[in-house]
């Protein structure tokens, strides 16, 4: 969005009841777009933060078993994350994965994204030696771009960003062309060259699904020795032993 208009965005993990108000307070008056991360690790935290932000477009990127120890189930996590729509402005848009249950949502406009061809913003990806090739389809029009990041989940994140741009009425061709400059934050699937070896650094955080994505990304690399160094996954509560297995 930086090339489309003046923008302000949350830094780091400023996504809680301290970070969101601080990010809002720091937003320059001339900003046309504001991007705010809203997070939670307990029930009832998303809606109040969304009410503060009052977004025109709200994005639910995924529903994973992170914090399942506190919320108890994936369904509880889904409901909590979808509460981000509570703060949407009139005629606002909820952007969400195509394969996420949405039959109980009838109070906002929904825009879906995903690898399913029935999604409003659908994508096909192809693995190359050192990049991912992505083709996105919106309103029967195709857009293509390359990503120098590794992992299906990171490709899906880029598709979600394009869906948000579409929901905002932004220049899609420009947004797609800017995807080639996308780099993952440190520890989020970065490709590193160390002593002639390729290292995939996905060390920022871990939950069962993100761990599976990381291992899948490793398995898709070119033939040769593959070594996975895995840490523990936290905040899984009573499900910890089962999910680690």
Positions of predicted regions on the chain:
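Residue-level signature of catalytic and energy-coupling elements of molecular machines
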Residues: 20, 61, 135, 202, ...
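Beta-strand->loop->alpha-helix junctions that form or flank phosphate-binding loops
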Residues: 13, 98, 108-129, 146-152, ...
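Cytosolic catalytic headpiece of P-type ATPases
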Residues: 63, 133-134, 157, 187
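Solvent-exposed alpha-helices and their adjacent loops that cap or buttress functional pockets
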Residues: 26-29, 50-53, 85-88, 116, ...
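Nucleotide phosphate-binding/pyrophosphate-handling subdomain across enzymes
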Residues: 48, 140-245
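Phosphate-binding loop of NTP-binding sites
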Residues: 1-93, 98, 102-109, 222
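General beta-strand structural signal in soluble alpha/beta enzymes
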Residues: 7-11, 36, 95-96, 112, ...
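Short, charged/polar "capping" segments at the starts of alpha-helices
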Residues: 100-105, 120, 235-238
């Amino acid at each position: 969005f930086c090339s489309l208009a003046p923008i302000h965005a949350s830094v780091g993990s400023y996504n809680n009841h301290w970070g969101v108000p601080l990010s809002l307070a720091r937003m320059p008056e001339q900003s046309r777009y504001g991007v705010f991360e809203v997070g939670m690790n307990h029930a009832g935290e998303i809606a109040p933060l969304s009410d503060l932000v009052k977004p025109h477009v709200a994005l639910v990127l995924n529903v994973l078993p992170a914090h399942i120890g506190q919320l108890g189930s994936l369904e509880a996590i889904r409901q909590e994350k979808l509460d981000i729509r509570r703060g949407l402005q009139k005629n606002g848009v909820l952007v969400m994965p195509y394969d996420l249950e949405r039959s109980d949502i009838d109070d906002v406009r929904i825009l879906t994204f995903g690898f399913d061809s029935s999604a409003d913003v659908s994508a096909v990806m192809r693995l190359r030696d050192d990049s991912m090739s992505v083709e996105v389809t919106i309103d029967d029009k195709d857009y293509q771009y390359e990503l120098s990041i590794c992992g299906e989940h990171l490709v899906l994140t880029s598709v979600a960003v394009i869906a948000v741009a579409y929901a905002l009425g932004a220049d899609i061709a420009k947004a797609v062309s800017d995807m080639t400059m996308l780099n993952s934050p440190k520890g989020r699937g970065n490709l590193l060259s160390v002593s002639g070896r390729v290292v995939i650094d996905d060390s920022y955080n871990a939950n069962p699904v993100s761990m599976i994505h990381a291992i899948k990304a490793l398995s898709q690399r070119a033939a040769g020795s593959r070594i996975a160094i895995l840490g523990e996954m936290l905040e899984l509560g009573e499900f910890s032993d089962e999910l680690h297995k």
